[in-house]
Curated annotation (Swiss-Prot):
InterPro entries for the chain: Ribosomal_bL28/bL31-like_sf, Ribosomal_bL31, Ribosomal_bL31_A, Ribosomal_bL31_sf
Complex formation: Part of the 50S ribosomal subunit.
Protein name as it appears in the record: Large ribosomal subunit protein bL31
Gene Ontology biological process terms, A to Z: translation
Entry's family note: Belongs to the bacterial ribosomal protein bL31 family. Type A subfamily.
Gene: rpmE
Function in brief: Binds the 23S rRNA.
Length: 90
């Protein structure tokens, strides 16, 4: 038996609104739920999604990080020499 006066009120027929229209009813602790997107107007679920990938993700990643290899190797060398010097001073 649940404890009295600690549970929120349950609304078995709570209305879900999207753009001012009732799109569905669900059970909730709120009588009305206002949403911006739901499965009825989301591009993925309606089939109107357009994927525009002018450059592949792998190619973009390789191009981005291949430029940084030359500059990144200099900073790695200076860090490694500093750490070796610091260990010998103890």
């Amino acid at each position: 038996m649940p404890k009295a006066d600690i549970h929120p009120e349950w609304y078995p027929e709570a209305k879900v609104y999207c753009n001012g229209e009732v799109v569905m009813t669900v059970g909730s602790t709120q009588p009305e739920i206002h949403v911006d997107v739901w499965s009825g107007n989301h591009p993925y679920f309606t089939g109107t999604q357009k994927i525009i990938d002018t450059e592949g993700r792998v190619e973009r990643f390789m191009r981005k990080y291949s430029k940084q290899e030359g500059s990144g190797s200099k900073s790695n060398k200076s860090k490694s020499t500093k750490s070796k010097k610091g260990k010998g001073k103890k």
